[in-house]
From Swiss-Prot:
Keywords noted in UniProt: Ribonucleoprotein, Ribosomal protein
Signal sequence annotation: none
Any GO molecular function: structural constituent of ribosome
Family in the record: Belongs to the bacterial ribosomal protein bL34 family.
Keyword Methyltransferase listed: no
Keyword Chloroplast annotated: no
Origin: domain of life: Bacteria
Protein name (record): Large ribosomal subunit protein bL34
InterPro entries with a match to the protein in the record: Ribosomal_bL34, Ribosomal_bL34_CS
One BP annotation, GO: translation
Biased composition regions of type Polar residues, renumbered to the chain: 1-10
GO cellular component terms given for this protein: ribonucleoprotein complex; ribosome
Amino acid sequence: MKRTFQPSTLKRNRSHGFRARMSTKNGRHILSRRRSKFRTRLTVSSN
């Protein structure tokens, strides 16, 4: 049986990356929330 998680960096960044977050209002809310918590990694793309 094939596993459900088939990792792909491109798909990952397109859905959860910094540019994807910045493109929507709610995405920017996510980033501001993570900044307020002093997260070292805001998104998956910014390692």
